[in-house]
């Protein structure tokens, strides 16, 4: 019964939010429903919001990193011009056109290698186009990019900019 009630509630949240991630504006499945206050027992509509898997993973970064599905990138020197929601949108756009392995393949690669897999580069034009699309589609600016969550095996070095030094470290929070 709880499962049925959750399915109905989930659909109402997705419909209310126009099946669009409220952080970055991504509007393709799969989409998740996030408990804003972090309490999975608080199913008040005001505590629920539609999020894409990447934005959801960022909100639960401790669990995501512990599961071996990603890492934390910290910039050293000037701040990255990219924000988390822009990075998420770019990564999803890349997956959507088949530039990267699927998220589940990335997760499997992380578990098998125990760390970041080989980085794959995407041309600057594709990145800029995807970030521009994010802005046009209502991507919300959340926080300055002092740190970013990135799934393992992605092109974070390219996104952080050639002039910056960055490192990826596995962190447990």
Identify the function of each model-found stretch.
Residues 1-8, 57-173:
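Extended charged
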Residues 2, 8, 12-14, 20-51, ...:
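Histidine-centered nuclease catalytic patch
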């Amino acid at each position: 019964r709880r499962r049925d009630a959750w399915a109905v509630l989930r659909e109402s949240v997705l419909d209310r939010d126009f099946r669009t991630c409220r952080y970055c504006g991504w509007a393709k499945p799969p989409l998740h429903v996030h408990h804003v206050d972090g309490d999975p027992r608080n199913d008040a509509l005001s505590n629920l919001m539609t999020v894409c898997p990447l934005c959801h993973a960022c909100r639960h970064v401790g669990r995501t990193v512990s599961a071996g599905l990603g890492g934390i990138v910290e910039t050293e020197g000037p701040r990255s011009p990219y924000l988390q929601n822009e990075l998420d949108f770019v990564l999803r756009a890349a997956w959507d056109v088949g530039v990267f392995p699927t998220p589940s393949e990335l997760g499997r690669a992380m578990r098998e290698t125990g760390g970041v897999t080989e980085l794959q580069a995407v041309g600057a034009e594709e990145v800029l186009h995807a970030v521009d699309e994010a802005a046009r589609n209502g991507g919300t600016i959340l926080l300055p990019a002092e740190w970013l969550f990135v799934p393992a095996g992605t092109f974070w070095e390219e996104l952080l900019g050639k002039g910056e030094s960055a490192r990826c470290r596995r962190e447990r929070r």
